[in-house]
Amino acid sequence: MTIRLRNRVNFFFFIIALVILAVNTAVFLYNFIAGNIAVPSDVISKSSFPLLRYDFWSVIASVIAINIYVVAVSFILLRTFEKTQATEVFFFLVFLTSLIFDTSRIYIPVRGISESFSYTLIHIGNLTLAARLLAPISLFALTAFCEEEFRQQTEQNCIICILVAVFFAVFLPVNTAIIGPNLCISYGFGKMVHGFSMVLYIASVMTLFIRNKKDSFSQINTAGFLMIIIGYNILFSASSIAGFASGVMILSAGTVIYLVKLHQHYLWID
């Protein structure tokens, strides 16, 4: 894929992300004003401390923050890397795709969806599960398949990442009767999915660390990448003010550090 075509894909992705943000926000606000938002009342808070106590609106804020993050970062990628050959941009867009899938959680509190065993709820469960699978897969691919010898297969590798995540998200069962505090629908083989994700996250950080050491490139880049992983998982799981705030800060800081160092790397190469 040429740089010009990549930039077009990036621009198209940015527009889609912007539209999804507008639709998600508008639909939620409409249902909130209409009194159609079912705020969970049976969630048992694990802490009595105000910042750590369960807060439904922190969950909603986290989902919206993820959506805003996708729009902002896709625009930054478009403007910052438009003249570079950074293969990482493709895989980062796939990672952002997983976050787009994750924003479907915002529809779960809408009355008529959360209070029924509808196909809509099942599809939302499939999307959130796909997000949980695609995030680690895309980040691992970002570190493992960005070398020169894999550059010709970048598009195919990105498509494979998405297809694998979607296939298993549809294949694995979801339990719409159980919805977590973070509005995530329960799914089968949860421990296996978490273990798989953890292995890929660790492998991706180690791969990037080794590659940066080999290329004599700053490990600050690796630290930023690790912060992206930590921040994303905190923000996804956030059900308190502290979780929301820390997730936003760590994810944002990690993204800035990683992308700045990555841009410096390609400026040096080009």
Where are the regions that the model predicts?
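Alpha-helical transmembrane segments of polytopic membrane proteins
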Residues: 58-67, 123-136, 187-201, 243-258
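Alpha-helical transmembrane segments in multipass membrane proteins, preferentially the mid-helix core
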Residues: 71-76, 137-147, 169-179, 191-219, ...
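Juxtamembrane "helix-exit" motif on the non-cytosolic side of transmembrane helices
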Residues: 108-118, 171-184, 231-242
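C-terminal transmembrane-bundle signature of multipass membrane proteins
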Residues: 17-35, 195-270
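Hydrophobic transmembrane alpha-helical segments in integral membrane proteins
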Residues: 6-17, 26-29, 45-67
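The cytoplasmic-loop to transmembrane-helix boundary for the fourth helix
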Residues: 8-18, 144-172
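Internal transmembrane alpha-helix with an interfacial aromatic "cap," most often the third helix
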Residues: 68-93, 99-158
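Central hydrophobic cores of alpha-helical transmembrane segments
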Residues: 91-98, 158-166, 218-229
